[in-house]
From Swiss-Prot:
Function statement: Involved in targeting and insertion of nascent membrane proteins into the cytoplasmic membrane. Binds directly to 7S RNA and mediates binding of the 54 kDa subunit of the SRP.
Source organism of this protein record: Pyrobaculum aerophilum (strain ATCC 51768 / DSM 7523 / JCM 9630 / CIP 104966 / NBRC 100827 / IM2)
Localization of this protein: Cytoplasm
GO molecular function: 7S RNA binding
Family: Belongs to the SRP19 family.
Entries under InterPro entries matching the protein: Signal_recog_particle_SRP19 (IPR002778), SRP19-like_sf (IPR036521), SRP19_arc-type (IPR022938)
Name listed for the protein in its UniProt record: Signal recognition particle 19 kDa protein
Hydrolase recorded as keyword: no
Gene Ontology BP annotations: SRP-dependent cotranslational protein targeting to membrane
């Protein structure tokens, strides 16, 4: 069922190891290598977003890969803006 009232942030969107043709939305220089759902949740909490987590879901174009999970972020911002902020926060946390 499609979730309403927010933006869906798949982990694939910010993963530097996934090519753009497979779903990455950020440039490779801004993306992070193999982000975990735990890191994304922590970054969203620190950024002050309200969200819902769906860990057992697979990104449809990569259904044959391992489970990625996604987060529904309750905001009207564009998904690229959210992805950029989350990836930046994850890079900051990994230092």
């Amino acid at each position: 069922m499609k979730k309403k009232g927010g933006r869906i942030l798949w982990l694939v969107y910010i993963d530097a190891s996934v090519p753009r043709s497979r779903g990455r939305v950020l440039p490779r220089g801004l993306a992070v290598e193999k982000p975990s759902l735990k890191e994304v949740v922590q970054a969203l909490e620190e950024l002050g977003y309200k969200f819902q987590v769906f860990p057992d879901k697979k990104y449809p174009p990569l259904w044959f890969e391992e489970k990625w999970g996604y987060v529904v972020v309750e905001t009207n911002e564009k998904i690229r803006e959210i992805a950029s902020k989350v990836a930046g926060k994850i890079r900051e946390m990994r230092r």
